[in-house]
Amino acid sequence: MEYHCVLFTVLLQLIIQPGRSRPTITPEGPRLTVPLYSNFSLHCQSNSTVRWQHENRPMRTLKEEQRQGQQTILKVNRAGPQHLGKYSCREEKTGEKSSIYVYVKDPENPFRRTIVFDIVAAEGDTTVIPCLATDPDMKNLNLQKCDGQPLPNSLRYSASLETGVSVEKVRKEFEGCYVCVGTLDAATVKSGRYQLTVRLVPDAPPPITLGQPQRVLLTQGEKLSLSCSTSNVNSDIAVKWKAPNGVNPSVHQNSHLLTEPITHVRTAILSLSSVTMQDAGNYSCEAINEKGTTAKPVWVNIYEKGFINITSVDNSTRRVRAGESLSLRVVMNAYPKPHTFSWSYSGVKLTNTTDHVITSRTHGNSYTSELKLVRLKVSESGIYTFSCLNRDATIRQTFEVHVISKPQIVSYEGPIDGQVRCVAEGYPTPQIKWYYCDLPHSRCSNLLNATQEEEDVVTVTMTNPPFGKGAVESRLNITKNNYATLECVASANGEIVYTLFSISENTVPHELFTPLLIGFVAAAVILVLILIVLTYKYMQKPKYQIQWKVIEGIHGNNYVYIDPTQLPYDHQWEFPRDKLRFGKTLGSGAFGKVVEATAYGMSKADTVMTVAVKMLKPSAHATEKEALMSELKVLSYLGNHINIVNLLGACTVGGPTLVITEYCCFGDLLNFLRRRRVYFYYTTLGEDAYYRNVMMQSEPNDSRNGYMTMKPSVLGILSSENRRSLNKGDSYSDSDAVSEILQEDGLTLDTEDLLSFSYQVAKGMDFLASKNCIHRDLAARNILLTQGRVAKICDFGLARDITTDSNYVVKGNARLPVKWMSPESIFECVYTFESDVWSYGILLWEIFSLGSSPYPGMPVDSKFYKMIKEGYRMESPEFSPSEMYDIMHSCWDADPVKRPSFSKIVEKIEQQISDSTKHIYLNFSSRLPAAPGPREESSSHVHRLNSVGSHSTATQPLLSSNDVFLDRSSPSHPVV
């Protein structure tokens, strides 16, 4: 049948409407029916090149003609069963396509003829029975069993004339013969028979069974044979061996089938005819199925010759009471298998009897031999020897067995010539003591008023053999005393025997010294105990140590620290004590405190400056005093930097040591972040604030880790530029400074502030590293903020009581900030520049979590240490840009060498902060003189920022190079 008129009309419509994006197929409609062996044509109209597809496959066997213009014509001559199906016209550029389904009507075959009647489906999959109708008028297409039996209850399917019957979630019980049934012209028609076979699918990777232990021992020249088997519910399984590099074994495989249940078994056998030392290593058997891969290792050890190594042995010296039993055991590793196990006693080989029971056990290359000695006699004391031999080695292990016997008094006599004599024997050799009392025929040692005779006693050891009983003789001279009864007591190993001697005259011994001696000893013991307790309490007190360490030299991984006590101290730092007026305490520890103070004439006679003074408490000891002096020397050695708490002066003569440093009005960074949480505005890099963090609440246990809160919070909501700018006016007074501090503390906090804090701390740490100084306790609690939100690194040292600070955990005999420490510092006590970089990464996490505790919800216990060893790292905090988290993660590299230096970190953060922040920081830095020198005073253009600067040249070396001024004539810039 030809369709030229229809096609011509459609072509005219396409020419009139050329803007359509999808190709158009004519004849129109979803399907086309053509008689068997007739010709038909399909026209595709498109603005670009198209390709015809049949059943979603490219057309290769059918004629395809490309004509001029926008039309592609597909011509099919003598349409047969193979031409039935869906035809698609697909644009090559856009992938857009249109489709039409062609029925090739065959009166004799209502279903398309096919040669595929065996269908294999995986269990759980959806499979299609391809019974495609040749006539679109077929009705009621359904699926039936070939034998007329009902379908399985759980079988669910969908039927379509164009796609066939789709069976969902195939199960093993669906296996069988099926036929498609439909109605055509009121008659029932059936398709051919389809045999459905369901292939079982495993639910897990395959199991592996090794034919030998996982540790195989061989000597050079022997044959290696390793066997590995696996099984699977279907035949889609493979097993193979992996050998160490350079080893080329032969591998033989075989398989067999088990029927109930059906199981496919595969075995791989690896062989080496003659092994060498290079063949040793880790061999791995791998089994693979549809669910994955399973592997089991086999360690092959090659030795030049055989060996026997004892791995466990009972105590070689054994003591047992007579009549008890004793077991002697030896555990050893050996290869090849020992051919001789033997036990001997005093050189005589023992046989397996009821008195000497010998047992042996074998597990792989481990062998155990045990000798049980039943109801030992004293005469069986002596040396027992275990011997083991194999082809190449011999070992011997000896045991000394001592049989404990009760002491016995074997003879006694007297009194004769003013002496009594007592002889005892046993093992161990007994001890003899003499007691006397005034009661006749009584055991003196049981009486409360019994007296032990220690004078005029002569004791001689008669025999003391290495094994068996020893004998001892004791003689007592009684010429000087008169007794009613004498008692000879022999004791050994908790056993006691005695004999009594009756004396004719009775003289009660003098007991004057006994109570005095007891009282003296008791008093001495009490005094010693008190001294021990006091010493222990003193040793347990926390010792103040300066955390900052200055390195003298680096030799590989070994750092040589400078003894800070050996550093020089320049007395130009001295400041008169009477010019300090102390205020409130800013921080306090076990041995010291930091106090706010006012310094008069620090840089000029009429200047007044707010400073922080670190001092010791009266309870401090000499070690703490020396440590504070060391801290003073280290600060003077380091020099000044805008991002560390700089030294302003000191008082070391005429009283206790005072260290005068800059006063930071906003306290520590940790509590500053926690106070500002409710005013935090989250911003993306380079943008103004757009999100206010109103959901976060202050943590109930905010610790005062350093300075107490200086000023009340004042709510301020300004733009990111105005919020950072300082007030500028014609004059500047102390009330102006207080007002400015109150306003700035109340201002909002945004992401640019957090980046600024991170940048400043990195700059400060880079400075310390350039001075070969290691911090060892870098954390937000040890960062102080001053006016302009300038961050300064400090070491609280004695100003913090670490015994009450939960951030410091007892480890050994010290309290350490474990959650801030690198793995090498925790497990190896190694502190380096790289360990400071790790702590800096934790500090970044604190900053971008707005003061949260690191590793939230994780106590410092054995599980915590295990997770750190296994590489656990914290996830990105809530307000951290991805670039900053990348820096954190690089700081936490397990390999210290791969961690970035502080100079690299500074470069990375500089890429994130805004140009205005960089300009502010450079402005501050450029106004920080590099060396002491005179400075002209200009009251109209400069003003003081607390103790960060002064109005004129100071006599103190560091103070003169530590002044920071803001030029009132310069444009207003945000303060970092």
Swiss-Prot record:
GO process annotations (BP): B cell differentiation; cell migration; developmental pigmentation; Fc receptor signaling pathway; gastro-intestinal system smooth muscle contraction; hematopoietic progenitor cell differentiation; Kit signaling pathway; melanocyte apoptotic process
Residues linked to a glycan: 39, 47, 282, 309, 315, 352, 449, 477
Disulfide bonds: 44-89, 131-180, 146-177, 228-285, 422-488
Signal peptide (residue range): 1-21
EC number(s) per entry: 2.7.10.1
Residue intervals of the Ig-like C2-type domain: 23-105, 100-199, 206-301, 308-402, 399-504
GO CC list: plasma membrane; receptor complex
UniProt main location, coarse: membrane
Location(s), subcellular: Cell membrane
Protein name (record): Mast/stem cell growth factor receptor kita
Lineage: Eukaryota, Metazoa, Chordata, Craniata, Vertebrata
